[in-house]
């Protein structure tokens, strides 16, 4: 038998709370709504921060500004709630529907906007991002005071003010705690950001429907409110059903070409395109390689260090889960074992099993000489007691502080301890032309831990001028020979890679340390100028 409707509004009476008894369905609905409000509000906040980090870089800055905007907007909403004096339940229901609709569709809207706007329209995307975050914050800020006032007005005999505030805030913080754990561990890995947003929008709308039914005796224009609930639920349900198609269409528009892989791991969005021009790998929307010229990058990264060593037997590759650096390392017949430390197991599985991708790396990931360790390189270096003749560091660019720590003195000290006597480490170090100071910051960081450095660069058409640094306890010398079959690197051409024209020449730069992470800020600033 359905619960009875709540009687029409009665005047509030300032009396002590009644003895504890069985909670009514209406009270439960309102307290559950507080739980859902907190959970959904935090999800929308986290989704906006995650999207901003993926699409704009610098996760600390993006999450800080998104959270700050959201909390400030909640304060505005709470202040504005004083001006809502009548029809509290109806106003709460409408706000709940708006939060569900706007918040639920926000990740999809931001994703579409980013893929539809021109590359130089970053400011327009930021305006949309913070406008949506602020709007949701204001609406959520309105809801909690309204719930308290509804509970106090309808159930004044049961709730003393101190108990009311305690109960509401308890449910509020419980909702925030549970979703903070479930968002990264459950929802995003299994639903993705777009469908996670829509799912929680549906939760908001479901609470609105429950409130509509329980307070039907008080609500004016019940049919109109019911139609609004049905409309919001319908829009969100259609969006949920079409979320995959929406994501596919947006990615097709953004990347162009034929997408042969579109998958999400626990760490990143992986997209691989194939067309007449070749195969491209994108991680979180950033190009990682193009098959038509990646050999220039990987030959330049690997062979100057390995060939100069003379007799490398044990090699460590950090990053490079696509296996392309491994392919070049395995050209050296004297190498007995290569250890690949790659954070994302999805990457190594994909590039080992997908026929087109495994063909690019020559099946390197399946080689008997290769040992794959899927873990964080920083932690692994801290714990290992192994040593290696050559260490190849092939991490993504330092676009955020998580990646930036892999370019710090602390990291290079750990790597130095893993170098065997006479060994070399080689690091990819972004573009010395576009990010000149960033490049020389990496060089200065390696030198700050006592290593001798040899900076060099190569032209990779997909990226332009790209930089590398060889570091070790002994100075680097030009090798006597290179492996056969290389397509770009030659002994005669190596000296030219060591020459830096005036627009790439060394500039003063401080070492990048965990305590300052200057490289992330410098990198963001320099590449930001190119994108504006």
Name each model-derived stretch:
Residues 474-532:
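SAM/dcSAM-binding transferase cores
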Residues 1-461, 466-475, 527-532:
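Alpha-helical transmembrane segments of multi-pass membrane proteins
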